[in-house]
């Protein structure tokens, strides 16, 4: 009975993509990694505010993390098309673990300064610029074409669920143990996903075909393709506007929660 119910759910909804072992492992372990990102993100804001009590420094840290994302995302997308995505994923996730663990260590040992935060934020931004296109490009290599729509929908759902629950999970750890342990927990959250990357295989990609092309030509063709389609062009504009004018509030929440609402920054940022 339960098997028939499960089969029905798998067939008639986006959950059917979980029939594929490797995709299911990546998504479930990837949720842990996504939650770890929010431990880092919330902790970074709180720590910046505790060190400086400056809205300007909150902005500096946000810019330090965003500039690599803006500049290197096209390069990351090109690498995801030209090289083995699984190897890239392993290397990038290892770098993320190292950066987050380093942030935990320097915070716990009391070595943290605003300048150290800037350096580590830049490093994390670099990993994010390479990870985002690899993460998205891996999904089509984990399921057959018939289940691709369901896989993309489920991937987006779980990713946004982590965006909602990650800060809520980080808040009690920040409140009870502090920022350093929160970073340590965040680094640990990446480990299950890192292990899973050695247990899966990706379907064949076109990496070899793309490897012979010049990287700059590949990037230019990507921009031409994106802006030659009206739907994609307007979508990029919407994303750019929301990133420029909407993200600022998220990056300043630690200061806003204390200055405007007289709340502990840990509570305000988590909310």
Features from the language model and the residues they span:
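Alpha-helical transmembrane-bundle signature of multi-pass membrane transport and export proteins
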Residues: 1-271
């Amino acid at each position: 009975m339960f098997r028939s119910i499960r089969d029905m759910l798998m067939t008639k909804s986006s959950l059917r993509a979980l029939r594929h072992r490797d995709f299911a492992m990546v998504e479930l372990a990837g949720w842990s990694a996504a939650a770890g990102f929010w431990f880092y993100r919330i902790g970074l804001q709180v720590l910046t505010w505790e060190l400086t009590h400056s809205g300007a420094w909150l902005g500096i840290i946000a810019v330090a993390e965003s500039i690599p994302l803006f500049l290197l995302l096209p390069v990351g997308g090109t690498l995801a098309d030209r090289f083995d995505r699984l190897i890239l994923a392993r290397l990038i996730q290892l770098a993320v673990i190292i950066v987050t663990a380093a942030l935990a260590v320097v915070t716990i040992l009391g070595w943290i300064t605003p300048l150290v935060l800037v350096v580590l934020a830049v490093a994390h931004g670099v990993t994010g610029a390479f990870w985002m296109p690899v993460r998205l490009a891996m999904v089509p290599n984990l399921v057959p074409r018939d289940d691709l729509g369901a896989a993309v929908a489920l991937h987006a759902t779980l990713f946004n669920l982590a965006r909602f629950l990650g800060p809520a999970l980080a808040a009690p750890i920040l409140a009870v143990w502090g920022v350093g342990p929160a970073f340590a927990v965040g680094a640990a959250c990446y480990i299950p996903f890192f292990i899973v990357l050695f247990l899966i295989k990706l379907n064949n990609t076109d990496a070899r075909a793309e490897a012979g092309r010049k990287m700059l030509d590949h990037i230019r063709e990507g921009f031409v393709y994106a802006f030659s389609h009206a739907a994609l062009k307007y979508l990029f504009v919407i994303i750019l506007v929301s990133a420029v004018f909407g993200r600022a509030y998220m990056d300043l929440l630690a200061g806003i929660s204390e200055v405007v609402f007289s709340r502990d920054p840990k509570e305000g940022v988590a909310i």
